[in-house]
A protein has these predicted regions:
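Conserved phosphate-coupling serine/threonine residues in phosphotransfer and NTP-handling enzymes
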Residues: 24, 141-143
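Short acidic capping loops at alpha-helix termini that bridge into adjacent secondary structure
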Residues: 13, 159-163, 190-194
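Active-site neighborhood of HAD-like aspartate-dependent phosphohydrolases
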Residues: 2-60
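A metal-dependent, Asp-based hydrolase signature
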Residues: 52-108, 124-129
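Acidic, Mg2+-coordinating phosphoryl-transfer loop and its flanking beta/alpha structural elements
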Residues: 195-231
Length: 243
């Protein structure tokens, strides 16, 4: 077991660390903003007037992306359902609304492309350091498992990770079952596992699963976006996370 030090906080008897992907290891702001804008435009082309409300729901305002907004933290299925709800408000039936939303997300995905965004500065070094210390490491993301696997492959992270877990069907964050399943897959107890993420959902999930601790990351110095964290850092201070 290892002691993890992050800023002035120490976590003792740690066996594993789970990382979120978007906004934690991956600087995905530009990708997510472009994706949300494309989805909104495609749906607005079919249902005029719905584009702007959808952008607001996604957490997009011009060039600003809210890291706590829907497109930043929700799973693919949650995003489809949220978009469909806005469509259904116009009087369309639920299944028609869901079909329009799913098609828009699929086509927007193809338009924007699946190439992962760059790693945040310091992310690779942290993974390397913690791996050398003998810790089990994994990604636990609200993105699909395929997106997680593509991210790991493109950035050549497989040597450092023992788990690549996304959300395909079933529960999403902040349901603690995701954290518990990840710990089970790694063969570690939740009480010996840290969660590193950039959303309240990450913190709630880990706390409800009785994790050893929660490390919150914020792009813009908004500690309320990671409420519940034991310690808060920003991406450029990633090097503060050491075994």
């Amino acid at each position: 077991m290892v002691t993890i030090k992050c800023k002035d906080v120490a976590f003792s008897n740690i066996e594993a660390v789970l990382f979120d992907k978007n906004g934690t290891l991956e600087d995905s702001e530009s990708y997510l903003r472009t994706l949300g804008q494309k989805i909104s435009r495609m749906i607005d082309a079919q249902i005029p007037g719905i584009g702007e409300p959808l952008l607001m729901a996604f957490g997009i305002n011009g060039d600003f992306l809210d890291p706590a907004g829907l497109i930043s933290v929700a799973s693919r299925r949650e995003t489809e359902i949220a978009a469909a709800a806005y469509i259904a408000e116009t009087g369309r039936g639920w299944f028609e609304s869901l079909k329009i939303a799913c098609q828009a997300l699929e086509e927007a995905d193809q338009y924007v492309g699946k190439t992962p965004s760059p790693l945040f500065m310091g992310s690779l070094e942290v993974l390397q350091s913690l791996s050398v210390a003998g810790l089990k490491l994994g990604i636990l993301s609200a993105a699909t498992t395929q997106e997680v696997q593509t991210f790991v492959r493109i950035h050549q992270l497989s040597d450092y990770l023992q788990l690549e877990k996304g959300v395909d069907d079933g529960p999403s964050k902040p349901d603690p079952i995701l954290f518990l399943e990840a710990c089970q897959a790694l063969g570690v107890a939740p009480g010996a596992t840290l969660m590193v993420g950039d959303s309240v959902g990450d913190m709630q999930m880990a706390r409800n699963a009785k994790a050893a601790g929660c490390i919150g990351i914020t792009w813009i110095g908004r500690a309320d976006n990671v409420q519940g964290a034991d310690v808060v850092i920003n991406p450029v201070s990633y090097t503060h996370l050491r075994a």
